[in-house]
C-alpha cells in the first residue's frame, strides 16, 4: 500500500509541477523579491492562519507580505515551495506531509511525527518545519451531550459496550480509506455500529444535532462542534495519526530575513483546537472575512503591543 501511495503521489506531484510551471496561480509570479509570499489553501482554517501570519510579520518586521491563495492541496503547496513561488506555507499537517511529500509510514505519536517531518523537510528540501500552533485537525468521533450522558461515553472504546444501539454518520470517503478507514477502525476497536450513514462531511454535524444519528465522525477543528455543544470522544487507542498544524518556511527566506523565525515562533502553542474551532466559526458561521478574524485574534491576544 505504501508503494502504491508513493507512486500515486509522484504522479500527482509531476502533474502539479507541470501545471505550476506552465501557468501562474493567483498571486504567483508577480511578486517583488522583497515581498514575503505566504501560501494558503482554500480552506477557512488555512485562510485565517495565513492572515494571522501576514499581519504578525508585517507588524513585527515591517516587511511586505502577500498571500498566495487557493493552493488546492498539500501537493500543490509543496510544489509551489519547491518552485520558489512561495516562501512560507501557513498550514501544514504532520500526518499528511509525512506520508505525502516524505513518502513515509504514518507515525501515531505526535512528538515523533513532528520530529520526523522536521528532519525530513530539512534534509530533503532545505525547509524549516516550525513547532505546532497548538491544534491538530484530525478525525474525531462526537456525540450529543444527552447521548454521552445516557451511555456514559467519554472515549471511543466506551462505544463498544453499546455498539448495537448506536447509529453513526461518517464521511463518504472514510468508508473506503486504507489504514485509517472504517475497516481498520473496526478491527482496532472491535466496534461495529448498528447502522452507518455515509454522507458528505458538511452535512454530518447538523444531522447529528438534529438526532438523525447517535454518533458522528468529523474534523476536530470544525466550528460547529462547540456551537452545537457536541462532545468529543477521546481516541484512547490513538488510532488516528496526528495532524498537528505548523508553518513551513524555506531556509532561503529565513537566511535572508532571520527575524521571521522569531515572529513565527511567537505562535508556538498559542492556538488550541478549541480556539481554532472558534476562529473557524467566526468565518463560517458568522460570515466574517478571514482577514478580520485574524486581526481580532491578534488584537485580543495583545500581539500588536510589541514592535511597530
UniProtKB/Swiss-Prot annotation:
PROSITE patterns: PROKAR_LIPOPROTEIN (PS51257)
Gene Ontology MF terms in the entry: transmembrane transporter activity
Compartment list: Cell membrane
Signal peptide: 1-22
Lipid-carrying residues in chain (N-palmitoyl cysteine): 23
UniProt topology in membrane: Lipid-anchor
InterPro entries referenced in this protein's UniProt entry, alphabetically: ABC_Gly_betaine_transp_sub-bd
Residues with lipid group (S-diacylglycerol cysteine): 23
Keywords for the protein's UniProt record, in alphabetical order: Cell membrane, Lipoprotein, Membrane, Palmitate, Signal, Stress response, Transport
The keyword Acyltransferase is assigned to this record: no
Keyword Membrane: yes
Cellular component terms (Gene Ontology): ATP-binding cassette (ABC) transporter complex
Functional summary from the UniProt entry: Part of the ABC transporter complex OpuCABCD involved in carnitine uptake. Involved, with BetL and GbuABC, in osmoprotection and cryoprotection of Listeria. Can also mediate weak glycine betaine transport.
Family, per entry: Belongs to the OsmX family.
PANTHER family in the record: ALIPHATIC SULFONATES-BINDING PROTEIN-RELATED, CHOLINE-BINDING PROTEIN
Quaternary structure annotation from Swiss-Prot or TrEMBL: The complex is composed of two ATP-binding proteins (OpuCA), two transmembrane proteins (OpuCB and OpuCD) and a solute-binding protein (OpuCC).
Entry protein name: Carnitine transport binding protein OpuCC
Lineage per the UniProt record: Bacteria, Bacillati, Bacillota, Bacilli, Bacillales
Gene designation: opuCC
